[in-house]
Amino acid sequence: MPREIKDIKDFLLKARRKDAKSVKIKKNQQNVKFKVRCSRFLYTLVITDKEKAEKLKQSLPPGLQVKEVK
């Protein structure tokens, strides 16, 4: 089931959880979507600022599988 997250800090907490499996990064012209797959929900964060998206990509946990989808 999908859930949308509005806060970057909340998204990072979800990404650091034990049951977080992977992150998909979808880029388009207007925004960047980060989707983290946990055991129950697929959490989505939408960012319109490209610089913030790059910083968030750098701050993802190192053990997490990251896929970039164009």
Swiss-Prot record:
GO terms for biological process: protein-RNA complex assembly; translation. GO terms for cellular component: cytosolic large ribosomal subunit. InterPro entries: Ribosomal_eL38 (IPR002675), Ribosomal_eL38_sf (IPR038464). The keyword Ribosomal protein applies. It holds the Pfam family Ribosomal_L38e. GO terms for molecular function: structural constituent of ribosome. Keywords: Ribonucleoprotein, Ribosomal protein. Signal peptide: none annotated. Belongs to the eukaryotic ribosomal protein eL38 family. This is Large ribosomal subunit protein eL38. The lineage of its organism: Eukaryota, Metazoa, Ecdysozoa, Arthropoda, Hexapoda. The gene is RpL38.
